[in-house]
């Protein structure tokens, strides 16, 4: 497995694993624009995209993981955690990273808790009946002290 920036040729691969861009032209266009802006990262095995993440500075100029998606058939294999850990590493110089997920997305909430993210609150009205929950994590280059 390799994590790399997405290329224009990955758009079709990304939309093949995530049903939202196939169902929404605007979401498809958003992912394409994000690839051109060099904010999309993929976890790939050969030419197959297993997961992708979109990392921007769109949240009050803070690093924000706008999207993290793992292909259905590749879930529960650690791909989400691997990609999330890389996004954290990319944000080290900023000292923090933010993200959000729907209240209904329990697996992502569990992953964020496992990785040490702190829950800050929720916003209603973005997805009808499914509030968005916001999280952040302080990042440090310091290595843990061993006893």
Locations of the language-model features?
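A short, internal acetyl-CoA/4′-phosphopantetheine-binding micro-motif in the GNAT/acyltransferase core
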Residues: 68-75, 101-102
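Conserved catalytic-core motifs of GNAT/GCN5-like acyltransferases
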Residues: 100-102, 118-134
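Acetyl-CoA-dependent GNAT
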Residues: 5-67, 71, 84, 90, ...
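Conserved short alpha-helix immediately C-terminal to the canonical SAM/SAH-binding motif I
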Residues: 83, 105-108
């Amino acid at each position: 497995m390799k994590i790399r920036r997405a290329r224009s040729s990955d758009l079709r691969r990304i939309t093949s694993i995530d049903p939202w861009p196939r169902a929404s032209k605007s979401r498809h266009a958003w992912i394409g624009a994000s690839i051109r802006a060099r904010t999309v990262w993929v976890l790939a095995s050969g030419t197959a995209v297993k997961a992708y993440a979109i990392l921007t500075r769109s949240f009050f100029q803070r690093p924000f993981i706008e999207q993290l998606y793992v292909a259905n058939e590749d879930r529960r294999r650690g791909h989400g955690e691997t990609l999330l850990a890389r996004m954290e590493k990319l944000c080290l110089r900023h000292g923090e990273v933010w993200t959000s997920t729907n209240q209904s997305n329990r697996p992502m909430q569990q992953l964020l808790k496992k990785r040490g993210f702190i829950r800050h609150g929720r916003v209603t009205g973005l997805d009808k009946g499914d509030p968005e929950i916001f999280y952040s994590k302080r990042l440090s280059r310091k290595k843990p002290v061993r006893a």
